């Protein structure tokens, strides 16, 4: 008679493991960091092995908003609307010096960091950042996703208050 084997794990660990290898990015590319973003998407760096290869072209199908480049005050409502259209759970990556702090375009028309309008989960510094830094950021985001608590029901609270 064959011995039956069972794998036991916690619900959060299983869902975290599945989600961390199925990241669907939505690139919001506005400036010169877009050239380096295209290099990251090439076969030389192969982001598919991290589960983040296929960019989505609608925010409703994505869970990672990659803000690449300069964000002006006129673009701020657009990026806020894109963020609001994304389904939960969602994460935001600020790609480059312009997205994180305004960069070299520090004047009255440029938003001094995308974190002033939407919450940012991970920052990638540099002008432009190297593809290796982007891969490292994806790996750190995967660790963050794997460590999160994943409620099955939408009304289940993250930190329940004892009665």
UniProtKB/Swiss-Prot annotation:
Metal-binding keyword on record: yes
Obligatory cofactor(s): [4Fe-4S] cluster
Membrane topology: Peripheral membrane protein
Main subcellular location of this protein, as a coarse class: membrane
Entry's EC annotation: 7.1.1.-
Pfam family, one: Oxidored_q6
Co-factor binding comment: Binds 1 [4Fe-4S] cluster.
Localization (cell): Cell inner membrane
SUPFAM superfamilies: HydA/Nqo6-like
Xref: PROSITE patterns: COMPLEX1_20K
GO biological process: aerobic respiration; electron transport coupled proton transport
Catalytic activity reported: a quinone + NADH + 5 H(+)(in) = a quinol + NAD(+) + 4 H(+)(out)
Keyword vocabulary terms for this entry: 4Fe-4S, Cell inner membrane, Cell membrane, Iron, Iron-sulfur, Membrane, Metal-binding, NAD, Quinone, Translocase, Transport, Ubiquinone
GO molecular function ontology, one term from the record: quinone binding
GO CC list: plasma membrane; respiratory chain complex I
Keyword rRNA processing found: no
Positions annotated to bind [4Fe-4S] cluster: 32-33, 98, 127
Subunit comment: NDH-1 is composed of 14 different subunits. Subunits NuoB, C, D, E, F, and G constitute the peripheral sector of the complex.
Described purpose of this protein according to its UniProt entry: NDH-1 shuttles electrons from NADH, via FMN and iron-sulfur (Fe-S) centers, to quinones in the respiratory chain. Couples the redox reaction to proton translocation (for every two electrons transferred, four hydrogen ions are translocated across the cytoplasmic membrane), and thus conserves the redox energy in a proton gradient.
Protein family: Belongs to the complex I 20 kDa subunit family.
Protein name: NADH-quinone oxidoreductase subunit B
């Amino acid at each position: 008679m064959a011995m039956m084997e069972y794998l036991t794990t916690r619900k959060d660990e299983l869902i975290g493991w599945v989600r961390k290898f199925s990241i669907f990015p939505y690139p919001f590319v506005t400036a010169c960091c877009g050239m380096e973003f295209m290099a990251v998407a090439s076969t030389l760096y192969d982001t598919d092995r991290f589960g983040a290869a296929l960019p989505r072209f609608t925010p409703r199908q994505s869970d990672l908003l990659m803000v690449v480049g300069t964000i002006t005050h006129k673009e701020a409502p657009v990026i806020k609307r894109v963020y609001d259209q994304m389904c939960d759970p969602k994460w935001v990556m600020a790609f480059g010096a312009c997205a994180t702090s305004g960069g070299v375009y520090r004047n009255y028309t440029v938003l001094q960091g995308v974190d002033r309008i939407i919450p940012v989960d991970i920052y990638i510094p540099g002008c432009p950042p190297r593809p290796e830094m982007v891969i490292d950021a994806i790996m750190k985001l995967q660790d963050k996703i794997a460590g999160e608590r994943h409620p099955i029901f939408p009304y289940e609270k993250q930190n329940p208050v004892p009665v």
